[in-house]
Amino acid sequence: MRQFIPMRRVLAVATLGALFWAAPASWAAAPPEAASCIACHGAGGMGNPAAGYPRLAGLPEQYLADQLRYFADGARNNAVMSGMAKPLSAAQVTALATYYSKLKPSGKPAPMPTGAAAAEGERLALRGDWEKGIPACIRCHGPGAVGVGENFPALVGQSAAYIEAQIKAWKDGSRSGDPLGLMHTVALRMTDAQTQAVAQWLAAQPLSPTKSASAKH
């Protein structure tokens, strides 16, 4: 007697199989917990820009581990990630952070904004707005915004939607854990228009800094 298999189950299995089929060769080294990450962050850890899910690939190991802990203890307010992070043991957090930190980021940047928005985004990212006490992004996140150390992650390779959402989260206090409260202080001084402009400009930058971009600060 043939057993009826619900179409929903067939589609779910097919989707999961497709995700694993598309996974990078390094997926063989992935910890089991990473299987829960790919639906939002992708098999290569580059996120889903359209949905606002961030890039994880190549971010600092300690930074990634810290973010999982912040989600678990509420320092970062996100219902989905809180539910994912709370059950993880310290060893599982370390394994996930180590794995994603070693993935090589890839992909194309978003289209460059035009007009006044592009000019304002570039100004804030490379020079800041010192009259309002807003330092340039590259002062902490490095030339090309590719990240510096464990506390200042790469901004390039992230979507405009994600960057904008995080600045707003720093501003309203739903995200914390920043060294010395730096991002909270900076975000409070930024207008919504500035937040959107710098997010769009950063999302349009290449994963590797160009000489011209690095030399403008």
Swiss-Prot record:
MF (Gene Ontology): electron transfer activity; heme binding; iron ion binding
Coiled-coil intervals: none
Cellular compartments per GO CC: periplasmic space
Annotated keywords: Heme, Iron, Metal-binding, Repeat, Signal
Domain Cytochrome c: from-to ranges: 29-104, 116-206
KW Isomerase (keyword) present: no
Modification(s) after translation: Binds 2 heme c groups covalently per subunit.
Sites where the protein binds heme c 1: 37, 40-41
PROSITE patterns (UniProt xref): CYTC
InterPro entries documented for this protein: Cyt_c-like_dom (IPR009056), Cyt_c-like_dom_sf (IPR036909), Cytochrome_c4-like (IPR024167), Cytochrome_c_Oxidase_Subunit (IPR050597)
Annotated binding of heme c 2, by residue: 137, 140-141
Signal peptide: 1-28
Function field: Acts as an electron acceptor for the thiosulfate dehydrogenase TsdA.
Protein name as catalogued: Thiosulfate dehydrogenase electron acceptor
Annotated organism of origin: Thiomonas intermedia (strain K12)
